[in-house]
Amino acid sequence: MRTLSFASKQFDSDLAVFRSGAAISREVSDSVAAILCDIRARGDAAVAHYALGFDGARLRPGEFRVGAREIADAARRLPAARRAALSAAHASIEDFNRKALPADWTARNRHGAVVGEKFDPIRRVGIYVPGGEVPLVSTALMTATLARIAQCPEIAAFTPCGADGRVAPDLLAAL
């Protein structure tokens, strides 16, 4: 692992080299902007076009949504060992994150006024889970579990499908 030391004489140049690796090229930025503009203009038809181009998936507008039944079926079709592993991971993530949730509190200040904080869940949460060739099941577990324990009433998950137009069953089960 490469380290940077503030005490080093070449710290500024080393930092510049390090930061340049995170820069997004103008070409990539322009390409993404054009795709987003097209999707805003043409909606689901544009999404289907890019799914074919990037993922090789032939999708039709109106067929993007995966229903609760398909998610439950995907979980049931998994081998028992994988279901158990997902369940254990979910329990660990939930246990950890429940401990990290902030708690409401109130107190009286020196003037006798009641002060405090109240934490309410975000009403609507969207989570993106990288999918396609290599679905990131861990991302689905981490983000969906946290949104649930935070009691977000509406959680929408977005993920690309494979070339067959299907979402990986492991990923669906993790949601």
Model feature map: region roles:
Residues A107-A173:
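Conserved small-residue-rich beta-alpha loop and adjacent elements
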Residues D38, Y50, L146, A173-A174:
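Residues within well-ordered alpha helices
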Residues M1-R123:
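N-terminal Rossmann-like NAD(P)+-binding subdomain of aldehyde/semialdehyde dehydrogenases
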Residues A22-S25, T145-L146, L175:
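Short, low-complexity, polar/charged sequence segments that are solvent-exposed and flexible
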